[in-house]
Amino acid sequence: MITLCLSALRGLHRAGGSRIRLRMTLGREAASPLQAMSSYTAAGRNVLRWDLSPEQIRTRTEELIAQTKQVYDTVGTINLEDVTYENCLQVLADIEVKYIVERTMLDFPQHVSSDREVRAASTEADKRLSRFDIEMSMREDVFQRIVHLQETCDLEKIKPEARRYLEKSIKMGKRNGLHLPEHVKNEIKSMKKRMSELCIDFNKNLNEDDTSLVFSKAELGALPDDFIDSLEKTDEDKYKVTLKYPHYFPVMKKCCVPETRRKMEMAFHTRCKEENTIILQQLLPLRAQVAKLLGYNTHADFVLELNTAKSTSHVATFLDDLSQKLKPLGEAEREFILSLKKKECEERGFAYDGKINAWDLHYYMTQTEELKYSVDQESLKEYFPIEVVTEGLLSIYQELLGLSFEQVADAHVWNKSVSLYTVKDKATGEVLGQFYLDLYPREGKYNHAACFGLQPGCLLPDGSRMMSVAALVVNFSQPIAGRPSLLRHDEVRTYFHEFGHVMHQICAQTDFARFSGTNVETDFVEVPSQMLENWVWDIDSLRKLSKHYRDGHPITDELLEKLVASRLVNTGLLTLRQIVLSKVDQSLHTNASLDAASEYAKYCTEILGVAATPGTNMPATFGHLAGGYDGQYYGYLWSEVFSMDMFHSCFRKEGIMNPEVGMKYRNLILKPGGSLDGMDMLQNFLQREPNQKAFLMSRGLNAS
């Protein structure tokens, strides 16, 4: 689902607090106030610390702000005739790197620390720094010097990436309203600060939510014993079930008691309902107002300007066309699910209401998979112990991309369950970066799956390269006595997807931090990781990823073939649900006065054909709305058009473990980071314009 980038340069990929991008440039002679931070930017080192106390976080936040502001103040007073590439554009890159690295240590702990006070201090630091980012991004004096540089320097003598950096700086200055009258700029600045705080609070509420429900063993009917044994028991000999993914989805997929599923679904989609509904009611109009002041019709128009889709009309056409193509498939899948429900109600003596409720969907989609393809995910997960999956995943990525991974002994980490790996180029031995694996749920931890970019891979002032550092943060089930953590196949797919983002972060080799890693268009950022999901549907790859946790015997070929064949199961309803979320996101960001819960309910009925549960407000739990995907959730489906085209035209055709194709992918898609437009990278790889054929086929549709 989601990557996150925590620097001031980046918006978030999946969820988490919204980041205002620090886009201004600074002069080289102004760099001295940050020399104390030079130890954080040594080439080939991971310089991140995870042991800061709440007081240290607060102190270092103020120090970072003071040091950086002094630099901006100096740059803002450079005489225009003295502005050069060297004292403006180049030094910006130096200072951005230092700022990013320090900021990461201050704002990342809110997502992963086990200490509530550290998380609180980190959240406050994030808010404070986000306000500061906005102040600095709207410094007209610095912007004037960037504009003057563009007008006076010989652009032909500047490297292409530096020229792109300059152009993007001008573009972002205008998108911040620096060309507008003073009173308008002040209004925009004030609203942006408020928007930033609202986004951080929205996702903090979700991360800190600790709602749980209590059920008897009978109320958890049909759930496997190992799952029930893993639950915390109450004094009344009942079981505590949280709303975290490792609890929620097994209950929704396997529990045969409709009332239990209803209670879980109701609770899941009313998480933070009161506070986050209020936040959305403030956030959406603020976004709309800022867009209007900047000259855009809607907030969606504002954000799409920088994406490959370019316009709301292109997005609407894409979603509506796909919805119509999937409509017959969705109807057929709903009819089959209703037949399953009717039959089960008769067998179990339940009242049959003649409809699919929201709490029925996962349950009967799971039954569909088991009946049509003889795939039982609960039994299948015994072949996916996390150690075996991790070993296989790392092996595949190393072979495919020409890399080697080495686990770091006694690594400095934020929790004892976290591991750290170093990534090297297999041919040259060059260290490219490091990544953390944080695999299990904890109280207060970010509760979805994401890749966080922590340290940018870019050039330093002395011309050496800072290595990239990323963290893969997921929430797989904890190991229990006598049994390791076992992954469902969809969790294996999630693991592959998020690790694809990690590889994008590590393999990018850019000059500027602004273009490092996953800093590409939001509707292109999922392309590399989605493409790599295809490996978990390949029989040979699955053999590398699996082994029974008890005796080590492999999955039978027959079961592997059934699993691969099941890829198309429920694809109509699953894709229609993505369209629902995309349409809701677009609607709320083209008409901020709409009621979010009502809009979601409308599209659930019209497109998915399954009504939302009355009293719930799914958008209040939808972290993407406040996490950098505002007006851009369509990007998941949009980018899958590109990822499927790449896979089927190159990897499927020439061999999915073909090292030449893997290196071509690494060099043409991953290595440029955001230094090239996404569509240019794609066409370089495909040697043609992309098309939808492979994507439509992956959805069980006729490509013609």
UniProtKB/Swiss-Prot annotation:
It catalyses: Preferential cleavage in neurotensin: 10-Pro-|-Tyr-11. This is Neurolysin, mitochondrial. GO terms for biological process: proteolysis; regulation of gluconeogenesis; regulation of skeletal muscle fiber differentiation. Keywords: Acetylation, Cytoplasm, Hydrolase, Metal-binding, Metalloprotease, Mitochondrion, Protease, Transit peptide, Zinc. Binds 1 zinc ion per subunit. Zn(2+) binds at H497, H501, H504. Its cofactor is Zn(2+). One of its GO terms (molecular function) is peptide binding. It comes from the Eukaryota. InterPro entries: MetalloPept_cat_dom_sf, Neurolysin/TOP_dom2, Neurolysin/TOP_N, Pept_M3A_M3B, Pept_M3A_M3B_dom. Residues 1-37 form a transit peptide. The active site is at E498. Transmembrane segments: none annotated. Its main location: mitochondrion. The modification N6-acetyllysine is found at K664. Hydrolyzes oligopeptides such as neurotensin, bradykinin and dynorphin A. Acts as a regulator of cannabinoid signaling pathway by mediating degradation of hemopressin, an antagonist peptide of the cannabinoid receptor CNR1. It is found in: Mitochondrion intermembrane space; Cytoplasm, Cytosol. Pfam families: Peptidase_M3. Its EC number is 3.4.24.16. Belongs to the peptidase M3 family. GO terms for cellular component: cytosol; mitochondrial intermembrane space; mitochondrion; plasma membrane.
